[in-house]
Amino acid sequence: MAQEQTKRGGGGGEDDDLSGGAGAGQERREKLAEETDDLLDEIDDVLEENAEDFVRAYVQKGGQ
């Protein structure tokens, strides 16, 4: 339990320098957004090619 609290408390040091951290945070958000868009595009491509197989596999695994 003490380790968990230590990890949470250690993460707050990044907020000390807002001028440098804001730019880095914005870059990270943009990179994550780009990676998410790429992943969603890949999922769309798979669904366009194999939508029927995807649905069949999903239902067999207990999806509704």
From Swiss-Prot:
**Region labeled ARC ATPase binding — which residues?**
21-58
Q: Keyword annotations for this protein?
A: Coiled coil, Isopeptide bond, Ubl conjugation pathway
Q: List the disulfide bonds.
A: none
Its GO biological process terms? modification-dependent protein catabolic process; proteasomal protein catabolic process; protein pupylation
Cross-link entry Isoglutamyl lysine isopeptide (Gln-Lys) (interchain with K-? in acceptor proteins), positions: Q64
Under Pfam families, the record lists:
Pup (PF05639)
Which GO molecular-function terms appear in the entry? proteasome binding; protein tag activity
| List of residues that carry Deamidated glutamine | Q64
Residue ranges, annotated region (Disordered): 1-37
Its pathway is: Protein degradation; proteasomal Pup-dependent pathway
Q: How is it modified after translation?
A: Is modified by deamidation of its C-terminal glutamine to glutamate by the deamidase Dop, a prerequisite to the subsequent pupylation process.
Q: Which residues form a coiled coil?
A: 24-52
NCBIfam families on file: pupylate_cterm (TIGR03687)
Quaternary organization: Strongly interacts with the proteasome-associated ATPase ARC through a hydrophobic interface; the interacting region of Pup lies in its C-terminal half. There is one Pup binding site per ARC hexamer ring.
UniProt family annotation: Belongs to the prokaryotic ubiquitin-like protein family.
Purpose: Protein modifier that is covalently attached to lysine residues of substrate proteins, thereby targeting them for proteasomal degradation. The tagging system is termed pupylation.
Q: What is known of its domains?
A: The N-terminal unstructured half of Pup provides a signal required to initiate unfolding and degradation by the proteasome but is not needed for pupylation, while the C-terminal helical half of Pup interacts with ARC to target proteins to the proteasome.
Protein name, entry field:
Prokaryotic ubiquitin-like protein Pup
